[in-house]
């Protein structure tokens, strides 16, 4: 028990340092224009598996589903092994990797940009929200823009900050990289369309499972933050009402 507490304390210290670095530095564009971001590399690995295993001709739905599960298992194992190897670099390496994979400042900047743009006019607001959502924004009204920004902010707070932090605390760099691989795969192949309904369902289900606790913790944190302006009860009521509609 003492050893477990010591490990968690060490990881918590690394996490706090990484959050501070992320908040101070953010996403340095000059760096990522020269070298690929780790998530980009994960995306390339997922694309490789997609091209090699996601064949629709002459393959049944169950076979494609099995291929998709095999693909995500291989990718997760490789990500965890990479994390295990990087763990030997010590807390400094862990802190740098965690800071790179957290997205607190980037999320804050993008959401604030939408809020600022809403004061400048509907056109600017549509452009700003278009930077963080994949849906069409040309016909959005102010209410739609605010709703889209809030939804995206809540989702990315869970996926980009809370979940990576929890998985790092629980599993160190192997847990962190395994989570980021699954989350990236879900964003790329976890769609309910003809191409990915079968092949991507494994990634989508694993992503749901790995986000089960982080998503609920994120919702509670948002409710806690809402108490600062006296809206805690309303936020909690919304969470209880709408939570069943989400994974």
Across the structure, where does each feature detected by a protein language model lie?
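Hydrophobic alpha-helical transmembrane segments
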Residues: 1-178, 182, 190-247
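Solvent-exposed interhelical
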Residues: 187
């Amino acid at each position: 028990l003492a050893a477990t507490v010591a490990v968690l304390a060490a990881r918590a210290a690394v996490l706090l340092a990484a959050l501070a670095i992320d908040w101070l530095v953010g996403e340095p564009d000059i760096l990522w224009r020269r070298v690929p971001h780790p998530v980009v590399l994960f995306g390339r690995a997922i694309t490789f598996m997609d091209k090699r295993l996601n064949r629709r001709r002459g393959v049944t739905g169950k076979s494609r589903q099995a291929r998709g599960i095999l693909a995500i298992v291989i990718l997760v194992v490789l990500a965890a092994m990479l994390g295990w190897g990087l763990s030997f670099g010590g807390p400094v390496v862990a802190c740098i990797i965690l800071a790179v994979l957290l997205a607190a400042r980037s999320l804050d900047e993008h959401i604030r940009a939408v809020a600022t743009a809403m004061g400048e006019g509907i056109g600017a607001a549509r452009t700003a929200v278009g930077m963080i959502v994949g849906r069409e924004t040309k016909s959005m009204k102010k209410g739609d823009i605010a709703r889209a920004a809030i939804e995206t902010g809540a989702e990315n707070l869970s996926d980009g900050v809370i979940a990576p932090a929890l998985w790092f605390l629980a599993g160190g760099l192997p847990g962190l990289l395994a989570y980021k691989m699954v989350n990236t795969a879900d964003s790329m192949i976890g769609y309910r369309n003809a191409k990915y309904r079968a092949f991507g369902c494994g990634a989508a289900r694993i992503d749901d499972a790995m986000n089960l606790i982080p998503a609920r913790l994120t919702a509670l944190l948002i409710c806690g933050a809402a108490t600062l302006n006296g809206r805690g009860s309303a936020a909690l009521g919304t969470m209880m009402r709408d939570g069943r509609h989400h994974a």
